[in-house]
């Protein structure tokens, strides 16, 4: 996607989709809509390349400004949140914290029982040399999903979502560098998602659900970004599962990937509504059912068959990743959605605090940012905002202007009064 020809195709695609998505493409390449407003840059060579604003910018946003003030108060004094608000905000923040901390060890070889990172870190680090609190594709795509649901008032629009993904990768929308003095490109694009982008562009946006790969294409790229769905649909578990599956199919044809998104949504909706984590996980096998038998087996925490690489017994206190997959790709272990979900459930099952869960999972290395993101979503939805270390949240706030938490708050309240909550987006 980095080649000029690909970028030209994307520019042409944006023009083709103009009427569908109400976008106006200016001659200089900027995108003018009530959703995106490109900030002017002193450097004219980059002013049209990077989207440096969010859907919450600009002054006259009515209740949006009220919500920004509200979220500041809630972050300062979490006890003012309702339990459900706290869990919803906690899940969104958990996604970014797990991602940001996990990036420090991403692509490093898997290790067990070695704890060397106990906080957000200091100085630049990780594959992409990010500052503490800066995030990768996991969170950026999760924010694209959140924005799409907010702007479309809870209706799922796969074309809108894919366009936001393209804007992230090609224009920097929702990346971690909006308040960074350095001009940086978006980072972390996975192989399966990259193929889905290319397919979408080559087809000129005819099919919003990817034709790249096949029904076995089940990386963790759709699971890692799923946080917004259970928050938005916390009162409708059937609808939440449906949207989780659909958002997965935008970039992954894989049956297991879609079913893992359903499973994650099921768990988090239960937690937001007050269920105990241990109870949810202990009853998961009997209460969760889907069309993919391997994911049903994972929910039961069982061995799938005689193949040692299909062991999903995450309740075992000594549970480990597939030994063969870990040997083949020790720096990428966890990138398969089943490995990702199994390890995330294991970590949440054997720990008793948000910080303990995050510290345990990111220190495993491998695909630590994505598995960390999933752990953060679950742990945040259970322990809530008040139990996330404040200093960790402060590190993230340097780069997000409290808008990740704001999205969690607004998604939770989206169906309370759509007109007042999402007016003028």
Give the ranges of each region predicted by the language model.
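Structured, active/binding-site neighborhoods that engage oxygen-rich ligands
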Residues: 2-425
């Amino acid at each position: 996607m980095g080649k000029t020809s690909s970028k030209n195709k994307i520019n042409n695609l944006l023009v083709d989709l103009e009427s569908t998505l109400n976008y106006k493409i200016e001659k200089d390449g900027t995108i003018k809509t009530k959703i995106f407003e490109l900030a002017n840059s002193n450097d004219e060579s980059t002013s049209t390349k990077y989207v440096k604003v969010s859907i919450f910018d600009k002054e006259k946003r009515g209740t949006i400004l009220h919500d920004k003030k509200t979220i500041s108060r809630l972050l300062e004094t979490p006890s003012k949140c309702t339990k459900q608000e706290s869990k919803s905000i906690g899940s969104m923040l958990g996604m970014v914290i797990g991602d940001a901390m996990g990036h420090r060890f991403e692509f490093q070889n898997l290790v067990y029982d070695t704890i060397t990172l106990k906080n957000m870190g200091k100085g630049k680090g990780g594959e992409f040399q990010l500052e503490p609190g800066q995030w990768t594709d996991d969170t950026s795509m999760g924010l694209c999903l959140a924005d799409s649901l907010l702007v479309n008032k809870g209706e799922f629009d796969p074309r809108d979502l894919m366009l936001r993904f393209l804007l992230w990768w090609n224009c920097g929308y929702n990346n971690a560098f909006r308040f960074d003095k350095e001009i940086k490109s978006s980072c972390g694009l996975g192989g399966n998602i990259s193929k889905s982008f290319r397919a979408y562009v080559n087809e000129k946006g005819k099919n919003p659900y990817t034709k790249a790969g096949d029904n076995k294409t089940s990386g963790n790229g759709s699971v890692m970004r799923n946080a917004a769905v259970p928050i938005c649909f916390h009162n409708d578990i059937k609808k939440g599962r449906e949207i989780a599956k659909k958002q997965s199919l935008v970039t992954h044809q894989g049956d297991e990937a879609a079913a893992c998104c359903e499973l994650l949504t099921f768990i988090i909706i239960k937690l937001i509504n007050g269920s105990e984590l241990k109870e949810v996980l202990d009853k998961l096998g009997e209460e969760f059912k889907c069309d993919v038998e391997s994911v049903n087996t994972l929910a039961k925490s069982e061995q799938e068959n005689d193949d040692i690489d299909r062991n999903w017994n995450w309740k075992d206190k000594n549970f480990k990743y597939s030994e063969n997959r870990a040997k083949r790709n020790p720096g990428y272990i966890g990138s398969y959605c089943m490995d990702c979900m199994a390890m995330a459930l294991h970590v949440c099952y054997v720990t008793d605090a948000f910080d303990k869960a995050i510290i345990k999972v990111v220190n495993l290395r491998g695909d630590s940012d994505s598995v960390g993101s999933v752990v953060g979503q679950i742990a945040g939805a259970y322990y809530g905002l008040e139990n996330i270390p404040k200093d960790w949240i402060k590190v993230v706030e340097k780069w997000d202007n409290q808008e990740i938490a704001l999205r969690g708050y607004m998604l939770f309240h989206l169906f309370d009064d759509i007109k007042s909550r999402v007016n003028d987006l």
